[in-house]
Regions:
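Gly/Gly-Pro-rich "capping" loops immediately C-terminal to redox-active cysteine motifs
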Residues: 31-37, 48-84, 88
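Short, cysteine/histidine-rich loop/knuckle motifs that typically chelate Zn2+
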Residues: 45
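N-terminal export/targeting leaders of redox proteins
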Residues: 1-28, 113-119
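Flexible coil segments in periplasmic/lumen-exposed cytochrome c-class electron-transfer proteins
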Residues: 23-32, 36, 40-41, 49, ...
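Hydrophobic alpha-helical segments
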Residues: 16, 53, 62, 76, ...
Length: 119
């Protein structure tokens, strides 16, 4: 009985460790390089220069982008008219850089808080 109990315990620890590693979050990217790629590869044409959306057909990407896995899935296999950015076109490292850039974009100020609107 102790053998099974010990084996079960070890198996549970290994599974939990693997699950925790899988949920570590997005890969680390270079936000400055991500901004360069975002602007150079045409993302801004539809999604706006700071990911705000509202230009053309692209939805907002920042602040608060999708979780990385969902974001990567949309970029690689878009469910809409966006062209797919396969790993041949955009490497995994470049995709992580773009995501890091989107995470680094601060929220836009609330337009209702602008003093000029009070006049």
């Amino acid at each position: 009985m102790h053998k099974y109990s010990y084996a079960t315990h070890v198996t549970a620890v290994v599974i939990c460790a693997a699950m925790a590693q899988a949920q570590d979050g997005p890969p680390t990217g270079d936000a400055a390089n991500g901004e360069r790629i975002y602007l150079a590869d045409g993302c801004a044409l539809c999604h706006g220069t700071v990911g705000q959306g509202g230009r053309g057909t692209g939805p907002h990407l920042a602040p608060n982008p999708l979780p990385f896995e969902a974001f990567a899935g949309h970029v690689r296999r878009p469910p809409n008219a966006m062209p797919p950015y396969t790993a041949v076109v955009l490497s995994d490292a470049e995709l992580a850089d773009i995501y890091a850039y989107l995470l680094a974009i601060p929220p836009l100020p609330d337009p209702k808080a602008a003093a000029i609107l009070d006049n």
